[in-house]
A protein has these predicted regions:
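Interaction interfaces in information-processing and related assembly proteins
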Residues: 1-215
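Cys/His-clustered metal-coordination modules, chiefly Zn-binding fingers
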Residues: 183-285
Length: 285
């Protein structure tokens, strides 16, 4: 099974929202790309997935989340990181993310409890870490390739990736041929820049295999925040905290981490939420 994506528009939107430096755009872009594909691989329409990579690099934690259509959102703790390029002239994603830490994967599959998995960071380059997650946590042989090409003006030129997973019945000939194809495959952004589309890329990495396109999606960078969600989050703070906010500030602002949208609440609105909080407490058995 193969999932592939041209995530240029998604990563571009993330860069515009978070105003990331080049290396952080590459890091967050890779994680957004992987998360979108992993979300689209979920079977239930209402399923969702969240990835968090928490390394010891200057970028801090990166968090992304996607629905089953591949629509994705994300943010990074430190959006601006300036570090030297690697010796080969490429962006040092590993240097920004760090080599020590963990990759966490949380899947909401509509069950009582979400599935939680985590693995130590393998390389900090994101793709290798995704591959390690599938091998260790889900025991699925996987190839993951991710790429983000950033222009000198910090805009995103190309971004994309693919995930290949072997079926349990795959024989050695299939595995050997796939390994050969992957080794000679050009970087995803190189293929996109040359004019290849996603189907071309899949056919390239699966050369020698019969390729059938099962379905296509058009995922976007899409935030799920709303005023109602923010109100529920505020209520969860408790009436004491809300009363304090109402007394101290004439207007309170709450900013969404994923899209930077600001929600404003007057002190009267905060007091009303506090009353709702108290009512909720009163009706508890």
């Amino acid at each position: 099974m193969v999932s592939a994506i041209d995530s240029t528009d998604i990563v571009s939107e993330a860069e515009k929202i978070h105003k990331t430096s080049a290396v952080v755009t590459a890091a967050l872009g890779r994680l957004l790309t992987a998360t979108s594909m992993m979300g689209n691989m979920l079977k239930g329409k209402d399923n969702s997935i969240t990835l968090k990579i928490a390394g010891d690099g200057p970028a801090g934690s990166l968090i992304t989340a996607a629905d089953a259509d591949g629509n994705v959102r994300g943010y990074v703790m430190n959006p601006v990181v300036e570090i030297p390029l690697k010796e080969n002239g490429k962006l040092d994603v590993c240097g920004a993310v760090g080599k020590n830490g963990s990759l966490y994967v949380i899947k909401d599959l509509g069950l009582k409890e979400p599935y939680n998995g985590f693995v130590p960071i393998t390389s900090g380059e994101i793709a290798e870490d995704i591959t390690a997650y599938y091998a260790i946590s889900e025991q699925i042989p996987t190839v993951c390739a991710l790429g983000v090409l950033v222009n000198p003006d910090l805009t995103v030129k190309k971004a994309g990736g693919y995930i290949i997973q072997l079926l349990p019945a795959a024989d050695d000939l299939v595995i050997d041929k796939l390994e050969e194809n992957v080794k000679k495959a050009k970087p995803v952004t190189t293929m996109l820049e040359s004019g290849m589309d996603i189907e071309d890329i899949v056919k390239s990495v699966l050369e020698g295999f019969e390729v059938e396109v099962l379905y296509t999606e058009n995922p976007e960078y899409k935030c799920k925040c709303s005023r109602d969600r923010v109100e529920r989050a505020l209520i969860s703070l408790g009436s004491k905290e809300l009363d304090s906010m109402a007394d101290e500030l004439p207007v309170s602002e709450v900013k969404c981490h994923f899209c930077d949208k600001v929600y404003k609440f007057t002190s009267e609105e905060i007091k009303k939420l506090s009353k709702n909080c108290k009512k909720t407490l009163d009706i508890k058995p």
